[in-house]
């Protein structure tokens, strides 16, 4: 099993609301608290976001209609993806899906044996092209949102600062993945990111400079392969399907 890099100590939020009973028709394999709490950017009143993946019963894939691939709930906010869908998202380096297997230990709420196996193969999902396309793509989306905000309105100004913080986070995570091969979910200096968010909300041109600087660093040789290695994910999914296969009862003679 791959040795997990040591993460800074992270305390889970005080008395988070309990997760509801499992809603998808399957078994949750891995689930944890993500978003601003994981990044270290949460503040009083911040939502607590949960992300996880589940295995639908294997027989559910044998009929005309495949099982639902995602289940989203509110109060609390939780998104669960079926195992195969999560793998497809992670192989494209989707930032939200990817962070699930890089969380600090204390933020996991469900971590079964197959979830542990997935964490052990997390590096195989990464690729230089995927990180560049996904992380820069999402950061650029945040930048475009900044340009359309009316910062004279206090609520819009607060949203602009939030978009700016996400932009900074995405760029820092992209560069760290490219240069170190490790997803920096927990930001080492959240206060600096908050301050940058406020600065960018007032001057979006600074975000453009950050985007350009990150792009330059991502253009340099890094430690990630050009393409992800799909073989570990494929083998893991076979184990998931085997573990959740229940043979149909024999027909009566």
List each model region and its residues.
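Long, intrinsically disordered low-complexity tandem-repeat segments
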Residues: 7-11, 15, 19
